[in-house]
Amino acid sequence: MLPLKWFTKVKIAVSHDYHFNVIVMIDCGADMNCIQEGLILSKYFEKSTERLVSANDTQMKIKYELNNAHVCYNNVCFKIPYVLVKNMTDKVILDLPFINALYPFFVEHDGITTDPFG
């Protein structure tokens, strides 16, 4: 079974005076939120010790992370951390924990369940 992926336009708000609109890939198979290196001004990111392997099992080069940015859609914003990655095909990838923030669900041995009330 292949992970689900889809695209949507969001606003990435790094600070009150630095934000941009971008088409992101939302990927149920991704383990981290990623932004293409070069999209974020250097004064906003910091050194990272994160490690990440791509879908084709190659080590991705991660030197920096961004911890205080928000992703916004229809004026609803979520603060989520990102790693900055060189040579990505997509400018921004949002991961499974981001999807879980929107709609909490649990993957268990016997299937996927959700509790919309808590």
What feature does the model see in each segment?
Residues P3, T8, H16-G118:
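Aspartic protease
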